[in-house]
């Protein structure tokens, strides 16, 4: 369950409290009463994937020779970002923002927490003319830009000429 969909901030609840409650609900969704993560089940994996995808907005641009995917990922280290191609035509951008653990170890106390931590993911079905062998990913200033080059257009088929023989 995602509390942000219920507009609870309108009832005077602080974002930090909502974030803590959301974390508790996420943990409860992903663990049994003894605190163990259950064996991977397709439904749970789908729900986690859907949450991660909903929390990762992206822009997609088409240029004459390429497609460009842009996602804001402030606070994420480049080493925590994965760019992959699945099933020959699905671009997957995924990773995890884990700063919360580091801060807690250093004795830092959050007064307000609005930036999302945890896993993120986006999947994009690539068009037929996308060249999956020519993908470039650049991460700079908290913005990931993935460029997928287009395949050259196929040459038009030339008509086949059949020689007519005299019988």
Curated annotation (Swiss-Prot):
It is found in: Cytoplasm. InterPro entries: A-crystallin/Hsp20_dom, HSP20-like_chaperone, Small_HSP. Induction: By heat shock. Keywords: Cytoplasm, Stress response. Its main location: cytoplasm. Residues 49-167 form the sHSP domain. It holds the Pfam family HSP20. This is 18.8 kDa class II heat shock protein. It comes from Ipomoea nil. The gene is SHSP-2.
């Amino acid at each position: 369950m995602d509390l942000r969909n219920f507009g609870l901030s309108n009832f005077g609840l602080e974002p930090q409290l909502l974030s803590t409650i959301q974390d508790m609900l996420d943990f409860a969704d992903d663990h049994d009463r003894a605190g163990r993560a259950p064996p991977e089940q397709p439904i749970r994996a789908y729900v986690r994937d859907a949450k991660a995808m909903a929390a990762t907005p992206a822009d997609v641009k088409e240029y004459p020779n390429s497609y460009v995917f842009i996602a804001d990922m402030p606070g994420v280290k480049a080493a925590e970002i994965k760019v992959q191609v699945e099933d020959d035509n699905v671009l997957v951008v995924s990773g995890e923002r884990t700063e919360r653990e580091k801060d807690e170890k250093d004795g830092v106390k959050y007064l307000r927490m609005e930036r999302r931590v945890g896993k993120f993911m986006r999947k994009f079905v690539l068009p037929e003319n996308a060249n999956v062998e020519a993908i470039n990913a650049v991460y700079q200033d908290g913005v990931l830009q993935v460029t997928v080059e287009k395949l050259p257009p196929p040459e038009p088929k030339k008509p086949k000429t059949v020689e007519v023989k005299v019988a």
